[in-house]
Amino acid sequence: MAKKLFSLLMALTLLAALALPAAFAEDYLDIINIADDNQSASYDLHKDTSVNGRNMLRGTVMEQLVTLKADGSIAPELCESYDVSDDNSAFTFYLRKGVKFHNGKEMTSADVVASLNRWLECFGTARKMVGDARFTVVDDYTVSLTLDHSAIMLLDMLAGAAQAAVIYPVESIEAVNADTGYVPADYIIGTGPYMFKEWAVDQYVLLERFDDYAAYGDPDQPIDGLWGYKHAYTKTLKYWIVKDAATRFNGLMSGE
């Protein structure tokens, strides 16, 4: 129960950092310190199933083609729309234009295809669902997947799987460590409102605001689940690795 409560508090902290109306932005701290009860093995969300990694990075640093609203429904995130055939065997995604990665490069179909095909290799359940089929580039802003059978749960997996179908630039996929199979920490590069700036193992993780973030959704509406307009009003989020529950609680109560 304590762990679930702590995860909820982390999620609420992130929502506060991202979703306050602009009129209140002047009241934001430059840095928010967050105590995390553990660290991810890698923060590579294609392979890592830890709650810590997902809570920290999903929707903040890393984004997906589609994501989940609060009611569990699926909504576009890095795509502006998508088509699914009546028999759920053909999927086409139309990407948002002008989305930038944290390395300054614009996201295109090549990045999405490289990311999702690597995700399939990492995530056995999704790989079994699609068989030998793989995502392909149609043009710079269109991606498709065509199967010889129905895959009715594919969108749900793309939006909400524990091994998240996040989108990296091609360079991150090419940099995968041959020994560990992980994307190196220096290549945890996404499209979200925060950048993965530093990981001091067993000490802290530092996220910093990405000023070129391409927001989507209505700025006058609150975030709906993981979907909606996000703006990083707080410049820095610092996650301290504090495994002792009493120490975390005391830090919360003291305002640290």
Protein language model regions, located:
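Aromatic- and charge-enriched surface segment that lines or borders ligand/interaction sites
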Residues: 80-125, 138, 144, 248-253
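Gly/Pro-rich hinge or "lid" segments in bacterial periplasmic/extracellular proteins
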Residues: 70-73, 161-240, 246-247
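Bacterial N-terminal signal peptides
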Residues: 10-17
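Positively charged n-region of N-terminal signal peptides that target proteins for export
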Residues: 1-5
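Surface-exposed binding/hinge segments that line
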Residues: 83, 127-175, 193-200
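Short, well-ordered beta-strand elements
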Residues: 28-39, 80, 90-93, 112-115, ...
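N-terminal lobe/hinge region of extracytoplasmic solute-binding protein
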Residues: 35-86, 117, 189
